[in-house]
Amino acid sequence: MKKTPLLNIALSRVIASLGHGDILMIVDAGMPVPAGVELIDLALTRGVPDFVSVLDVVLSEMQVESHVLSNEMAEVKPPALQVIESLNLDDQLGQQRWISHEDLKVLSRKAKAIIRTGECQPYSNVALVSGVVF
């Protein structure tokens, strides 16, 4: 059995396969997933699992170079935003970029995979850009 926090087989496989610059998205329950992009659907019910729990586990395994958020997230300020801001202070998410929610949907077409959570707070979505550990 793995010793690290991440137990989900599909998610572990995707993170292990990421190369420099690949995009992995963590999204709320309402974010559409484009055809052809791998979906790792973790959603069980409203709020389970929540965005922050999934982000924490993903960050335990993934080197992040930068991340992309929607402008709407800054306006609505879901609880996930405070956590992301805290992670930024610790330099765990690299450079931050803001785009419109519609542009985030367009960017999702380039994602290697999208992780759907049970999060129901609007605009709780992030695109993580993979970095390297060397």
UniProtKB/Swiss-Prot annotation:
A GO cellular component annotation in the UniProt record: cytosol
Binding-site residues for substrate, renumbered to this chain: D28, H101, Y123, S124, N125
Keywords assigned: Carbohydrate metabolism, Cytoplasm, Isomerase
Biological processes, Gene Ontology terms: D-ribose catabolic process
Function: Catalyzes the interconversion of beta-pyran and beta-furan forms of D-ribose.
Subunit text: Homodecamer.
Protein name: D-ribose pyranase
